[in-house]
Amino acid sequence: GMKQGLEFIADRSHTITEENLFRLYQMTIGDFLPAEDRLLPEHWYRHDSVYIVGSKVEHTGLPWQKLPAYMAELVAFAAEKTEQNNLIKAAILHFAFAYLHPYFDGNGRMARLLHLWYLVQQGYSSALFVPMSRFVEESRSRYYKAYTQVEQNQQISGVLDVTPFLVYFAKSVYHRLGEDQPQPRTLQAFEEALRQGKVTEKERALWQFVLTAYGSEEFSTKRLEKDFG
């Protein structure tokens, strides 16, 4: 589940490739879906249309026949050396992945994992301690409004400009990065305890998972057992 996925992206030898995206998806989401939402054998992406529906059809995912080419471009963009700020580029990857909607289910979770994964690849391992899912969930209406605004602007101008999404992320997620997070001294003390053998690898994994998945949010032991496994 999610624990395996976080461990997978924490390993910097697991670079962002199409094959690794597929592996990450299967271990965190794909293997737990009902049959009708699973990927076909030998398929890395969905094999049919998908619609995001609210009170109406909010978004139609990219036609499935085009997904291999577009996902290859997305992965190439992730690997490309650019002068863009890493936080901005991570948010662009997040938007593009969810916009393409390569799966029948779990696209939002995968977009957030890809976001964190890219930051880890750029050397920001501390990103794994950020409860991004909670920040997005708490601003869900603004999250979807940003997507809608991008699409509406595209219909008018013919240009896909992700600025509204970047503004959303800067204000609603990145602005909160210092909120309720462990202080540097706390992290250093924990790492030292781990080196000295006072903390086991299992305890380390559990602590990292709690920080990433819940942040300062309250949770029950039952929920932790279900999520962490």
List each language-model region with its residue ranges.
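FIC/Doc superfamily catalytic core
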Residues: 1-229
